[in-house]
A protein has these predicted regions:
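Conserved beta-strand elements of the Class I
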Residues: 9, 55-59, 114
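Short internal beta-strands
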Residues: 80-85
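Phosphate-bearing ligand-interacting subdomains
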Residues: 87-145
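Short, solvent-exposed loop/turn segments at secondary-structure junctions
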Residues: 15-16, 23, 61-65, 118-122
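Glycine-rich adenosine-cofactor-binding loop
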Residues: 53-73
Length: 145
């Protein structure tokens, strides 16, 4: 669907709620593992926003971001830089990829920005930062966590 111009977004209000028990199939079956969901996300990225691209930017050099960075590099993408807010990581390299500050993120230029940050509350902060820089989630930037 993303490859056909459709977009995905998180809505601000609860649309449906149900009781979640620990014995649900989605909690016990391997088909619903985090790895299975990552495979699904990756397939949709390759068919959608990454189709025909050779370069990509990334946001997130932590536990959630490093596996995505490794995957992108293994798939042959050139990752121009990884955006990070941790002062310890800014100015270093991870897998030979420069780590830059969020304040150094350039405006959108057609290069997909993949965002892999799992910290609670980070998504909202990143969305605000992206909007100020002219990015539109689902058009210029994609959250994968």
């Amino acid at each position: 669907a993303l490859g056909q111009g459709h977009t995905a977004a998180k809505v601000p209000e609860v649309l449906f709620d149900w009781i979640d028990s620990g014995n649900r199939l989605t909690r016990t079956d391997e088909r619903y593992s985090p790895e299975a969901f990552d495979r699904c996300r990756r397939a949709h990225l390759l068919d959608g926003p990454l189709a025909g691209k050779t370069e990509v930017d990334m946001w997130g050099a932590g536990q959630a971001g490093k596996p995505w960075l490794s995957w992108l590099l293994a798939k042959g993408f050139t990752v121009r830089h990884v955006v990070e807010v941790s002062p310890k990581k800014i100015g270093t390299k991870i897998h030979d990829t420069p780590v830059i500050s969020d304040t150094d993120l350039p405006p959108p230029d057609g290069t997909p920005l993949i965002i892999a940050v799992g910290a609670a509350g980070a998504r909202e902060l990143i969305e605000t930062d992206l909007a100020q820089k002219g990015y539109t989630p689902g058009k210029d930037a994609w959250f994968v966590c």
